[in-house]
Amino acid sequence: MGLLSLAIWTPIFFGVVLLALGRDDQARMVRWLALIGSLVSLLVTLPLYSRFDTSSSAMQFVEKTPWIERFNVWYHLGVDGIAFWFILLTAFITVVVVISAWEVITERVNQYMGAFLILSGLMIGVFCALDGILFYTFFEATLIPMYLIIGIWGGPNKIYAAFKFFLYTLLGSLLMLVALIYLYTKAGGSFEILTWHKLPLSMSAQTLLFFAFLAAFAVKVPMWPVHTWLPDVHVEAPTGGSAVLAAIMLKLGAYGFLRFSLPIAPDAAHEYAWLMIGLSIIAVIYVGLVAMVQQDMKKLVAYSSVAHMGFVTLGFFIFSDIGVSGGLVQMIAHGFVSAAMFLCIGVLYDRVHSRQIASYGGVVNTMPNFAAFAILFAMANCGLPATAGFVGEWMVILGAVKANFWLGLAAATALIFGAAYTLWMVKRVYLGPIANDDVRALTDINAREFLMLSLLAIAVLYMGLYPKPFTDVMNASVADLLKHVSASKL
């Protein structure tokens, strides 16, 4: 087995073993097995980093075996600088989520942990797949564990949220399947994504393909106006579900743009860049304003996710190396920061069982250690320099200003809104006098919660202070992608 196959199938194997274990009286063993499984899965991805050649833009660690020979479908994996960090991010966040669920999930523990490990493997599969059908299989299969996680361990409205999540994302993907089959016939019966990149296509074909992929990926990102499923799902999902959804699942859509929309339909991408930039700016400004009036902490962070992902799509469609790299860095940073924000809300929810901002106030007085973490992550969420949240946003704004000054100005206003809604939440939840008896009775974080938050805090600070390892890996691949996209296929 190659390294990428190990990265995909190790967590899935542990997940299936956990599902087979069954009863809740084995919960303690199940938790330890889940932790061991997630740690092994993370360790399996580490050799990728030491062996990755940052100077090359080619696919690395390639594996290719026939899968469905009749239709020329291959089990074809490979990773370049664009996909590389998301494999490590997925494995890392899975470890944190297993730790976060330790004492919190008490019913059907084996199914909960199993679902997360299987989901982790499937998401890594999306980032490695180089065959259209393989990509589609992994992309759609991620819906199933997430649907169960929301529908079984979610809040009071969980069934509605799970259905909404499933239908929205599934309907978008159906158009993508049509696009994949069209490309298959065009390419003489090949599902190779890299072959599709070289296909000469007419403008009308590119336009249809571009919008078919847009339907699938915009829902996943989610871009405005198809973002309405996200706040509902985040509010109902359990803490771990929210963390994985925000940190990794949203990235599958943005990754799809770079792997499909831009290289397969470059002329259409340039033609409709104004549309994508417009939708991104709306997401960044309008959704930022919507976040300011939220009373529910999870909804606030959910809307802030839409605004942050607006930066990502903006960076991609200004077609400059600093913009695309900035978008990728923002995706990784948002993975750390959004997971941390949701886990912090989970820490409070486990104690008070309320997500309403009005239920809190003066938490810093009773939980000083926790408040220090929470405020650090909040600062990263508004893009404070020296935190992960700053680097990507700054790169995208720099790229936007180079492309068009007014565009850069519009993007920069988002930082003001980001600071406004985040700091307002911090002020009302953490600062000031103790608001009520619930807050007075709070106990500070235990060792498990401290470990989970400190892992993320280290990641957020390291990435903010020294982003070079992150950008070095992607530079060659981003340059190659832009060279490809700048050449017309007509």
What are these regions (language model features)?
Residues 2-3, 17-114, 190, 194-198, ...:
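Transmembrane helix-loop-helix hairpins at membrane boundaries of multipass inner-membrane proteins
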Residues 5-21, 35-50, 89-101, 119-121, ...:
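Central hydrophobic cores of alpha-helical transmembrane segments in multi-pass inner-membrane proteins
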Residues 224, 338-341, 408-441:
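Predominantly late transmembrane helices and immediately cytosolic-facing juxtamembrane segments
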Residues 1-10, 79-90, 132-145, 206-219, ...:
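Structural signature of hydrophobic alpha-helical transmembrane segments
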Residues 15-20, 46, 95-99, 121-125, ...:
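Alpha-helical transmembrane segments of multipass membrane proteins
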Residues 24-29, 114-118, 122-205, 290-303, ...:
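Alpha-helical multi-pass transmembrane bundles of energy-transducing inner-membrane proteins
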